[in-house]
Amino acid sequence: MGKHQNTVGSSTYEKIKHDIIFGQLVPGSKLKLELIKSQYEASVSTLRETLNRLASEGFVLAEEQRGFYVTEVSQRDLIEIAKLRVLLECHALKASVGSGDDDWEGNLVAAHHKLQLMEKKMIAGDISEKETWKRYDWEFHLAVIKACNSKNLLDLHSILYDKYLRYQMLVFTF
């Protein structure tokens, strides 16, 4: 039973985070538990846990006695996220270059190739596969820093990447 709840909680977390990143849940909108309960097929307690987790990552704002809201977007926030992402990626890249092996390099080349092919399609006007592009872009950026040997750095990068992606999806640029 505990495992099932973890699966439901993880699934709910992924769905809501996806909907925030891809704009189905609009910045500033109130997340009314009773309304989203059926949409995400989750209990109120699972939703509270999920929304608190997303609040700790900065995707949701939890206001005492008022509820949960999708975090607003701003130019200032975007600039800060972009600067932090560059800082982390450059640091992780240095570490990866220093410790990466042939497998790391091969995975990096393969990830770049997949992303490059997808971006050629998108430049040609085919934007039907933005989910696939998102996955390939993530795989490439992760491959670049994967050999940094720091789980904490990779975890922080993942959160910043998703925050940055949210801004990209609002205007859909790549």
Can you describe what each PLM-predicted range is?
Residues 102-170:
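Conserved amphipathic alpha-helical segments that form helical-bundle/coiled-coil interaction surfaces
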Residues 1-98, 152:
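Short linear motifs at protein or domain termini
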Residues 172-174:
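Short, intrinsically disordered, charge-balanced linker/junction segments flanking boundaries
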